Amino acid sequence: MSWRNNLRDVEPYVAGEQPKMSNLIKLNTNENPYEPGEKVKEAIQSFDPFKLRLYPDADASKLKHLIAEYHGLEDDQVFLGNGSDEVLALTFLTCFNGQNPILFPDITYSFYPVYCELFNIDYKTVALDDAFKIKKEDYFNKNGGIIFPNPNAPTGELMSVDDIEDIIKHNSESVVVIDEAYIDFGGETVIPLLKKYDNLLVIHTFSKFRSLAGSRLGVALGNKELVSHLYDVKNSFNSYPIDALAQVIGEASIQDSEVIKEHAKKIIATRERTKKALKEMGFTMTDSYSNFIFIHHDDYDAEYIFKELRKKHIIVRYFNAPRINQYLRVTIGNDEEMDAFLDAVKEIIQAS
């Protein structure tokens, strides 16, 4: 059969497990434990299904305007896609086709190398330091583009805006993409830097902070020319990526922002309480600024804890990968879920 040779060897991204078991505490895919705001629920209830017979607004104009207004930008600085994964894929295809390899951390979002293999993009992974932090100087070398999450995933470590700005300054001929999927759980966004740098692109998602993982809404924010090129590529694939109901839900979510910020505060408080309890059990962890924690115990195998938790219907994320195969990534759920998680971990340790 004749098809593109590079596609034969692509190893697709493996998404977090979505188990169907009952009485499940699901702490493996960084979903928000709280419901979307009331305006989202009202928007869904009042949506006229007769509208689904028509194609949606291809530009998602109202949603785009609300997002731009929320971030203090112009409408034509906003790119919308069907989830941030689609936005990232189109970003790789649009921005990372130079002669030099692109750079991203060795421990990061595992979709990045998949995009590179899929689109035949040369890349080089840059090792995090022993504390799983990004060293800005490692990104001052010649490259065809740079991308990393901030906070990073799965470590949760946060890089300062000043350090990111240094990277942007040293790479004026490359596009620097900052994936801010988790920025609203304690970090500082680099969006204000868009006023100073044309080579910066910022990726956001409605999945985490806004509790809309099931609706699939992703955003890229950048200078007008860069965003225009993203739309050129997107429209060569699909002119209608945001369905009509998702647009209405997204609009309502922006209007619900103050309520959602209170949910984020709850998650942060629960995260810090959980970290304290785990430290008392002998766990160590990274300085997570996200809605998850990345934990390790010197005396207990991570995969063993992962499997024992599963027996108790608690699902966390285990990565069988170099440097991190003795760590677990644990999504921060609500207080009841995290109490059950802590009790289960204590039982596992005491029984070992």
Question: What is each of the regions a protein language model found here?
Answer:
Residues 1-54, 142:
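N-terminal "arm"/small-domain region of PLP-dependent enzymes with the aminotransferase-like
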Residues 52, 61-101:
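Phosphate-binding glycine-rich loop
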Residues 94-149:
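PLP-dependent aminotransferase-like
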Residues 129-184:
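Active-site phosphate-binding strand-loop segment of PLP-dependent enzymes
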Residues 162, 308-312, 317, 321-352:
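PLP-dependent enzyme catalytic core of the Aspartate aminotransferase-like
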Residues 199-279, 283-286:
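PLP-dependent aminotransferase class I/II
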Residues 268, 280-312, 328:
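Conserved PLP-binding catalytic core of the aspartate aminotransferase-like
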